[in-house]
Amino acid sequence: GSHCKKCYQPHYEQVVLRLRSKDGGNTDLVLVRGKRVYTSKRDRPMPQYPAPFAMVLRKSLTNARLKAIEQIGFDRVLRFVFENSHGRFHLYVEVFRDGNIILTDGDDTIIQPLTHASYADRTLKRGIIYNPPPAAENPYDLNFESFKDLMNSSDRNLGRTLGGVLNLGAGVSAAVCADSGNKPEADIHEVDLTKVWDSLNLLLHGEWKGYLFKNEGEYEQA
């Protein structure tokens, strides 16, 4: 894996880890709490003096090797696993509204969160064990009967149930609705759940491949 050479905080909600690969090239791993995670090679201005959170990251992660990137269940929480001579460190990035970025040791004791926060079901502050948000429903774990039970017990429309209760998000739930011949605002008790289930499974388990669109009506498999 790549080594972390430098940590920056160019914005109060953004952290940039500069990674050096085995071939010597640099790539920025950009973490935006509550929004997105991506890599970039763009040359961007960095603060002259590091913010306190960036200083903590530098102390723990400088020259650490990135060993793994893991998703916590089906939730929008990523765990970046780093390791150096001082031990193992986890950097959790919560990619949902009001999410956070949290540095822990190898036992998940919080070294420093980007922002201290308290919620109804958890607290994020230095010195306590990191607990992710309550686990969301994982559609990969459902069978048709449990799927029907979840859908029939919902008081939301089809799109909101797929997006919220099944944790698919707006875009994926809209695709399932369209493929099953339904509108997102459809009454969940008036749709054919067998067709919705078939469309969901096609999306989750189908062998999808990319396509390159060249001109109107022309495309080829990438």
Q: Each predicted region: which residue ranges?
A:
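Extended, highly charged segments
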Residues: 1-222
